[in-house]
Swiss-Prot record:
SUPFAM superfamilies noted in UniProt: P-loop containing nucleoside triphosphate hydrolases
Gene3D superfamilies per UniProt: P-loop containing nucleotide triphosphate hydrolases
GO terms of molecular function: ABC-type D-ribose transporter activity; ATP binding; ATP hydrolysis activity
Subunit structure: The complex is composed of an ATP-binding protein (RbsA), two transmembrane proteins (RbsC) and a solute-binding protein (RbsB).
Protein function: Part of the ABC transporter complex RbsABC involved in ribose import. Responsible for energy coupling to the transport system.
GO cellular component: plasma membrane
Protein name listed in UniProt: Ribose import ATP-binding protein RbsA 1
Keyword field: ATP-binding, Cell inner membrane, Cell membrane, Membrane, Nucleotide-binding, Repeat, Sugar transport, Translocase, Transport
Keyword Cell membrane annotated: yes
UniProt KW Coiled coil keyword: no
Catalysed conversion reaction: D-ribose(out) + ATP + H2O = D-ribose(in) + ADP + phosphate + H(+)
Domain ABC transporter positions: 5-241, 254-498
Subcellular locations according to the entry: Cell inner membrane
Organism of provenance: Burkholderia thailandensis (strain ATCC 700388 / DSM 13276 / CCUG 48851 / CIP 106301 / E264)
């Protein structure tokens, strides 16, 4: 094997915790190497060490057999290590050329920027990627996929020989992801080594050559893609074999009482008027393509988005929800798609995040919060939901994605909310944490909670939902239940004009 990158015995300690313990990693020239592990396994810490952001406490880094010590990120770049983070670092109002050469502009003899030369170099880079990018347009006008290719181009313009791709498909459509994989294969052909981090095992099997798994900051093993399967990888990641990600569905209760009846919901002027109902103890899926109206309908439902028409009944009584505060008072809670920016105050503790929707619950002498009672209640919810953290006063930004999602759920349970809207609840969460979230959702419905599940992942919709409302162009095309819930049927209604006869099903 023509090894270009060798990490040996990498150990990293932070106060009170050993984040990495003796990690070994070998990556060959022209190889796409997957790095797998649950959130908190140490992937990000290892990549930050490779990029010069953290120094290792023990261990060595070698590039082309030459030992390297990176004092900072610039040292790693100079050694040929590039990274494309999940969150882009582009300047929105600058074009692709200016973003590529920001801070290291090429200059002519008079010290002026040589724009023509930089533009030619940028065109060569994108030709190398096989991508057409408008070099004159501000990058904010480019698609998400094109912005990602600009990030990759930045790394290549710095002569990156080892390229780290951190969850690169998280915001891409399937077509854009396929285009990215084509670019990765072309870079592989050119001899660039890539470390590919993804929670999507189907992507790993599609594009990677070898796979290294970390668990709890330790090296578990490296395997050839062709010599393993999904079950074996999951067992390596979580330390146990997960036979079924989705818990069994209970029998469909067609006579269950409706807790929420939406008699008319029209999000935009001249748009379709939808009707649906949510039953006690069920998971109702909102399925459809991006832009189909799933999320906008849910936001309009709770008053977080304006609606032209909104008529609904809560447990048989007419209710007006003019905003999220009204929804909160009515016992309806939203777990938003972006938990870090919309669902949590990440700089706050678990206790403060759990209590924020119900500050009066543990008040004493009218004005003072009983911090001890608040901590006890938070500790009970942490135990009930399986939140892995030392204390209720642990900061939320130190938790994994799965544990952060559980904190959002705990906040609503602390308020005794009985109707929960989950918007993309497992996005960015590893496979073990997904199984825990799914089990938790079923435990909630068994206690009489009702859930609306909005998801772009068809297996999640099919595996978790008792009924599914399929949206297309803002309209509910059909409400499916029982054996009718399968991927083909959902996609047929989501993409075709064949409207279901029961699209006003209640």
């Amino acid at each position: 094997m023509d090894t270009i990158l060798a990490l040996t015995g990498i150990t990293k300690r932070f106060p009170g915790v050993v984040a990495l313990r003796g990690i070994d990693l070998r990556v060959a020239r022209g190889e796409i190497h997957a790095l797998l592990g649950e959130n908190g396994a140490g992937k990000s810490t290892l990549m930050k060490i490779l990029c010069g952001i953290y120094p290792p406490d023990e261990g060595t880094i070698a590039i082309d057999g030459e030992p390297r010590r990176f004092a900072n990120h610039h040292d790693a770049i100079a050694a040929g290590v590039g990274i494309v983070f999940q969150e882009f670092s582009l300047i929105p109002d600058l074009n692709a050329v200016d973003n590529l050469f920001l801070g290291r502009e090429w200059r002519g003899r008079l010290g002026l920027r040589d724009r023509a030369r930089m533009r030619r170099a940028a065109a060569d880079i994108f030709a190398r990627l096989g991508m057409a990018v408008d070099l004159s347009a501000p990058v904010r006008e480019l698609s998400v996929a094109q912005q990602q290719f600009v990030e990759i181009g930045k790394a290549l313009s710095l002569d990156a020989r080892v390229l780290i791709l951190d969850e690169p498909t998280a915001t891409l459509t399937p077509a854009e992801a396929a285009r990215l994989f084509g670019v990765m294969r072309e870079l592989k052909r050119q001899g660039v080594a890539m470390i590919f981090i993804s929670h999507h095992l189907d992507e790993i099997f599609e594009v990677c050559d070898r796979i290294t798994v970390l668990r709890d900051g330790q090296y578990v093993g490296t395997t050839q893609r062709a010599r393993t399967d999904v079950g074996a990888l999951v067992e390596m990641m979580v330390g146990r074999r997960i036979e079924h990600s989705f818990p069994p569905k209970p029998p469909l209760a067609r006579d269950a009482a409706a807790v929420l009846e939406v008699d008319a919901l029209q999000v935009r002027e001249n748009g379709p008027v939808n009707r649906f109902a949510l039953r006690e103890g069920e998971i109702l899926g909102f399925a459809g393509l991006v832009g189909s109206g799933r999320t906008s309908s849910a936001l309009a439902l709770i008053g977080a988005k304006p609606a032209r028409v909104r008529r609904m009944r809560l447990r048989g009584r007419a209710v007006r929800l003019s905003g999220p505060a009204d929804a909160l008072a009515a016992g309806i809670g939203l777990l938003p798609e972006s938990r870090k920016t919309q669902g949590l105050i990440t700089e706050f503790s678990i206790r403060h995040n759990v209590a924020i929707n119900n500050l009066g619950k543990h008040r004493r002498l009218r004005w003072f919060v009983d911090a001890a009672a608040e901590a006890r209640a938070t500790r009970e919810l942490m135990k009930r939901l399986g939140v892995k953290a030392p204390t209720p006063d642990t900061r939320v930004d130190t938790l994994s994605g799965g544990n952060q999602q559980k904190v959002v759920i705990a906040r609503w349970l602390n308020h005794h909310t009985r109707i929960l809207i989950f918007d993309e609840p497992t996005r960015g969460i590893d496979i073990g944490a997904k199984a825990e979230i799914y089990q938790l959702m079923r435990e909630l419905t068994a206690r009489g909670y009702s859930i609306v599940l909005i998801s772009s992942e068809l297996p999640e919709i099919v595996g978790m939902c008792d009924r599914v409302a399929v949206f297309r162009q803002g309209r509910i095309e059909a409400v499916l239940d029982g054996d009718a819930i399968d991927a083909n049927t959902v996609m047929t209604y989501a993409t075709s004009d064949a409207r279901g006869a029961n699209h006003e099903h209640a």
